[in-house]
Structure formats: structure tokens, C-alpha cells
Amino acid sequence: MIRRRRLRASENLRALVRETAVSASDLIYPVFVIEGKDIKNPIDSMPGIYQYSIDRLDEELDRIREAGVKGVLLFGIPAHKDECGTEAYNEHGIIQEAIRYIKKVFPELVVIADICLCEYTSHGHCGVIKDGIILNDETLPLLAKTAVTCAQAGADMVAPSNMMDGHVAAIREALDEAGYEMTPIMAYSAKMASGYYGPFRDAAHSAPGFGDRKTYQMDYHNPREAMRDIQDDIDEGADIIIIKPALAFLDILKTASWETDMPLCAYNVSGEYSMVKAAAANGWIDEKKIVMENMIGMKRAGAQMIITYHALDVANWLKEE
């Protein structure tokens, strides 16, 4: 008889033969920074997550430092929005000033700047609009300028999330020309037009004012198209590839791990987070067990790193083990 249970007999024995693990250094924590003073706004649809003004960031940075999380992904929420999202590439915009502040007080933290226009445009779309159409090529210089200003402010990495064709190449060229050839690009290469983003759009004030984003974000029915998009971004100079959302697209993550040797990042998005939080609040699930199972699922599928709103909880739970 084959007895698989021999290696399951105790927790320590199971730990010895365990094939997949997650650590605090695998985690990236999203942080929302809002223009203004003395602001800590709870995000109702994302329990435990807040918008912070720069002068209130220290309390969040203290939590990150204590948990042992090594990286943050920054999203800016400006006071002023316009048709072209000019605050995104303002050298003294909210995201640029937040980067400067964090690198001053917590220099060892890896600061990743999200590069998109949707939080900064009055219409909530990720590019320049004319006659209701998102203009791809006209948007690229604005994204490139945003990336350069973030690098100038001290960002360790930029993460273009806008899904315009050619955006990685445009950003790579602009960074290189500005002397930031060593600034890596973490590209949202397989970013689906997903229903899982709703709570994030509340948090970042970035819901589109009309229509949707299906003309530029990926159709989630198409796994082969996802691999083409991933390869395009690699060819254009991406250093890390993001699959977003993660849990409904573990097949894309696994295929990418087979077909490329690039570092892969799973984005455990707001809707995934909020569903767990809601079920846990109602006593329907054990939050820690579900979250850790999700983390391992993403790692097992091939993610070297995970962007997750659970990051601080996970890091603290790992300390307890």
C-alpha cells in the first residue's frame, strides 16, 4: 500500500516537505495618498484600508516597518483634476511629493509608483479623450512624463497600469533619456477588464465618468491574448510582469511562469480583498485561513511577489508562526 499520510503525520513533518511558502519579503502593500492636511479617510468598501495625507503617512509607515513588508505601491489622489490629468506629471504633485517624503523617512522601503492618468483626469479614463475616444498615441508622452517625474522624486520602480499600446516602450525610452536607465518597470501586462476593481475605484476616486475600460484593458475570456500582451511588454523593456486580478486568473499566471523566465507579480485586487473581509465580518469564514490559502495559491501558480491589501496582516501572522 502507498501511504502518503506518513509525511502528513505532524505539523513539523509537513513543514519539512512543504513545497511552497510565502514570506513578508514577497509582499507589496498598496498605499493611497490624498492631497490635503491631517487626513485619514477610511475606505468603506475596503475595511482596514485608508487614504492618508502626507502629514499622516508616518503612522502607516510605522505599521509597514513593524510588519517587515519591504515594498509599497503608491496611488495618488489629487485635489485638482482636468481633461489631461496634468497633476499626474506635475513635478510637485501628490504622488511625487509622497515619494520624496517616504524616501526621506524610510529610505530602505522599495517605493513603486503606479503610472496611470485615471486618478488625475476629470473623466476618470486612463488617457486623453477626443469625441469620446481614448487616444492611445497622444497619451503615451503624458505617461512617459509621469514616470520620469516619479523617478526624479526617488521612486525605486514605476508600474504602468494604463494598458495603452506601446506604453512600456515609451516609458523605457523616456526614463533612459532622462538618465534613469536603472529604474525598473513593473508592467501591468495582463490587466483584465474586470469586475473586481470596484472598491479600488472608490479608494482612488478613479471610476470612469462614462463608458468602461474594455477598449484598452484586456478581455478576460482570452488567455492566449494575455500571453501576447505579456510578450509585448517584455519585448518593450518590462522587468517584472503583473497579472491582475490574480485569483480568477491563476491559469494566466501559471502559463506565464512556464513560458517566460521574467519575475511575475500577482495583484490580489480590491474586490478579492473586500469579499474576504465581508465574509469574515459575518463570521462565515476564518479570515486568516482563507487569506493564507489565497497567498499560497498565487505563489504556487508562479508569483514571486504579491501586491495585496492583506500584506500587513499576512506579515504579522507569519511572525506568530
Label the predicted regions.
Residues M1-R18:
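N-terminal amphipathic/basic leader segments beginning at the initiator methionine
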Residues S10, V22-I28, I34-E321:
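Alpha/beta enzyme core
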